Amino acid sequence: MTTFWSQTINRQNGGVATATATATATAATTTPTAGGTGAGTTTSTKGMITPTPFNIDINNDLNDFDGKFIETFKPDLELQKKYRSFIQREGALSFLRTEITQSMSKRDICVLILNLGYPKKAVEDYPILTLKELAYILLKLMLTDSAQLEPKVEIDENDNKNDGTNNSDIDSDIDSNSDMDSQSESGELDDAMDVDDSLSENEDEYDQDMSTTTLKRTINMTPFKYKLPDLISDLSRAKKIMVVTGAGISTSLGIPDFRSFKGLYNQLSKLNLSDPQKVFDLQTFMREPGLFYTIAHLVLPPDGKFSLLHAFLKLLQDKHKLLRNYTQNIDNLEQRAGLKSEKLVQCHGSFAKAKCVSCQGIFAGEKIYNHIRRKQVPRCAICWKNTKQAPIHFGAIKPTITFFGEDLPERFHTLMDKDLQQIDLFLVIGTSLKVEPVASIIERVPYKVPKILINKDPIPNRGFNLQLLGLCDDVVSYLCKCLKWDIPHADFNNNDEFKLSKLKNGDWEIVKKSTSTKK
């Protein structure tokens, strides 16, 4: 239910009024300009922004709402066998507790349903269903699946004879109110499927859930032996390297990561939120856009800079080795470093563009940078042109960042399916792999492809063949020194020396110990 002041913004003295004592969002204060439409209102003010008057390619940023991916989706039969085998050993309840996380999107639920072997017809209404509705479709499908313990073959809308399942039967199962065989099991499954659009109540609970999920996903084969010289050799020969990056590649620029002691979530503790991640929750933004803008300046990219690691990615591209960089970062520094748009997938969107939540107008990201630095809510001038009073979120402009509760861009899923068939080396750099669906990419990488982690902290039980621990910039500097590659960045020095410490499990810790004068 919408309430007005304190949940309202008024137009006074030529623009957006400053907040009353009970308002939490801060819009830019205004200065009257020529062309006012009447006493106390104007058509343009500071803090008001006009949408970009031309079309912009925002494939990296906008979300997919049309559900077309269902028509072309092909279930992963190997994954389906693993799922069914796991259910047979551990039970449906354990499976749901393992696979369902608070960060899952609607699309993730659909993919899980289809990879379990259920027909596409069961999720054909995906675009208009809520997250919770899709979760309960999955629940009912599993509860009414008499062949649950037997691996199924791929089900296609035009070929339902493969497993003897009829789409209309599935629909009937979903819509029926028939009694379940076991009320206690049903209740437990309901608890396991208690999916809400909000996140966990605190970060510790969320991380604990993810850790449990990680441990239960050790159903993959043991990684083959792989040594540091093997990586040096593979970097030299590889032509299709997939790189997954996270916040750790930007920390050298002063941009905080999310989960370390000095990370963003720790800094957000002063906001007295039950869950710091709610700052990046879509429903929270619609209720209180000012909350996001109190912290957005912390993750705003610095002007004109990018890290040595970003330059390393550009080097892989220039050497025709980079298949794709899947970044979880929203700072858009990959493109600043020179990565081509076709080589980059911004899994969680970016600050490159912004969008009005009311009229869907698109803006160049730079237009709201000053508002972000001033902790102000930017507002759409078009929406406010003839408006005197509206809900607090009306005309608010949001960066094209994928918030919790939003689907990832369709481009992520389309290219991922294609890239996994070509990849010859898999690098994960600067991420703890805590957020789905990016966290599960490694599980889809073919077994024969070497999987390398470059990160400050280790990630156990995820199938990495080799883990190189240290600052991301230092580790890639060492690798490039071994390869006699020059990284085009001011912080790279061929004369740097490194200390290597071999760990008991065969992984390495790499630390830069000195810097000499460049030749």
From Swiss-Prot:
<dbReference type="InterPro" id="IPR003000">
    <property type="entry name" value="Sirtuin"/>
</dbReference>
<dbReference type="Pfam" id="PF02146">
    <property type="entry name" value="SIR2"/>
</dbReference>
<keyword id="KW-0678">Repressor</keyword>
<feature type="binding site">
    <location>
        <begin position="246"/>
        <end position="265"/>
    </location>
    <ligand>
        <name>NAD(+)</name>
    </ligand>
</feature>
<feature type="compositionally biased region" description="Acidic residues">
    <location>
        <begin position="187"/>
        <end position="208"/>
    </location>
</feature>
<feature type="binding site">
    <location>
        <position position="356"/>
    </location>
    <ligand>
        <name>Zn(2+)</name>
    </ligand>
</feature>
<keyword id="KW-0520">NAD</keyword>
<dbReference type="GO" id="GO:0032995">
    <property type="term" value="P:regulation of fungal-type cell wall biogenesis"/>
</dbReference>
<protein>
    <recommendedName>
        <fullName>NAD-dependent histone deacetylase SIR2</fullName>
        <ecNumber>2.3.1.286</ecNumber>
    </recommendedName>
</protein>
<keyword id="KW-0804">Transcription</keyword>
<dbReference type="GO" id="GO:0071453">
    <property type="term" value="P:cellular response to oxygen levels"/>
</dbReference>
<keyword id="KW-0862">Zinc</keyword>
<dbReference type="GO" id="GO:0036166">
    <property type="term" value="P:phenotypic switching"/>
</dbReference>
<keyword id="KW-0808">Transferase</keyword>
<dbReference type="GO" id="GO:0005634">
    <property type="term" value="C:nucleus"/>
</dbReference>
<feature type="binding site">
    <location>
        <position position="383"/>
    </location>
    <ligand>
        <name>Zn(2+)</name>
    </ligand>
</feature>
<feature type="binding site">
    <location>
        <begin position="328"/>
        <end position="331"/>
    </location>
    <ligand>
        <name>NAD(+)</name>
    </ligand>
</feature>
<feature type="region of interest" description="Disordered">
    <location>
        <begin position="154"/>
        <end position="212"/>
    </location>
</feature>
<dbReference type="InterPro" id="IPR050134">
    <property type="entry name" value="NAD-dep_sirtuin_deacylases"/>
</dbReference>
<feature type="binding site">
    <location>
        <position position="472"/>
    </location>
    <ligand>
        <name>NAD(+)</name>
    </ligand>
</feature>
<feature type="domain" description="Deacetylase sirtuin-type">
    <location>
        <begin position="221"/>
        <end position="486"/>
    </location>
</feature>
<dbReference type="GO" id="GO:0045595">
    <property type="term" value="P:regulation of cell differentiation"/>
</dbReference>
<dbReference type="InterPro" id="IPR026590">
    <property type="entry name" value="Ssirtuin_cat_dom"/>
</dbReference>
<dbReference type="GO" id="GO:0031507">
    <property type="term" value="P:heterochromatin formation"/>
</dbReference>
<dbReference type="GO" id="GO:0052562">
    <property type="term" value="P:symbiont-mediated suppression of host immune response"/>
</dbReference>
<feature type="binding site">
    <location>
        <position position="380"/>
    </location>
    <ligand>
        <name>Zn(2+)</name>
    </ligand>
</feature>
<dbReference type="GO" id="GO:0048239">
    <property type="term" value="P:negative regulation of DNA recombination at telomere"/>
</dbReference>
<dbReference type="InterPro" id="IPR026591">
    <property type="entry name" value="Sirtuin_cat_small_dom_sf"/>
</dbReference>
<feature type="binding site">
    <location>
        <position position="359"/>
    </location>
    <ligand>
        <name>Zn(2+)</name>
    </ligand>
</feature>
<dbReference type="GO" id="GO:0044406">
    <property type="term" value="P:adhesion of symbiont to host"/>
</dbReference>
<comment type="subunit">
    <text>Interacts with HXK1.</text>
</comment>
<comment type="similarity">
    <text>Belongs to the sirtuin family. Class I subfamily.</text>
</comment>
<feature type="active site" description="Proton acceptor">
    <location>
        <position position="348"/>
    </location>
</feature>
<feature type="binding site">
    <location>
        <begin position="430"/>
        <end position="432"/>
    </location>
    <ligand>
        <name>NAD(+)</name>
    </ligand>
</feature>
<dbReference type="GO" id="GO:0070403">
    <property type="term" value="F:NAD+ binding"/>
</dbReference>
<comment type="function">
    <text>NAD-dependent deacetylase. Heterochromatin component that silences transcription at silent mating loci, telomeres and the ribosomal DNA, and that also suppresses recombination in the rDNA and extends replicative life span. It acts as a NAD-dependent histone deacetylase, which deacetylates 'Lys-9' and 'Lys-14' of Histone H3 and 'Lys-16' of Histone H4. Functions in the distribution of oxidatively damaged proteins during cell division. Mediates phenotypic switching.</text>
</comment>
<dbReference type="GO" id="GO:0046970">
    <property type="term" value="F:histone H4K16 deacetylase activity, NAD-dependent"/>
</dbReference>
<dbReference type="GO" id="GO:0046872">
    <property type="term" value="F:metal ion binding"/>
</dbReference>
<feature type="binding site">
    <location>
        <begin position="455"/>
        <end position="457"/>
    </location>
    <ligand>
        <name>NAD(+)</name>
    </ligand>
</feature>
<keyword id="KW-0479">Metal-binding</keyword>
<dbReference type="InterPro" id="IPR029035">
    <property type="entry name" value="DHS-like_NAD/FAD-binding_dom"/>
</dbReference>
<dbReference type="GO" id="GO:0000183">
    <property type="term" value="P:rDNA heterochromatin formation"/>
</dbReference>
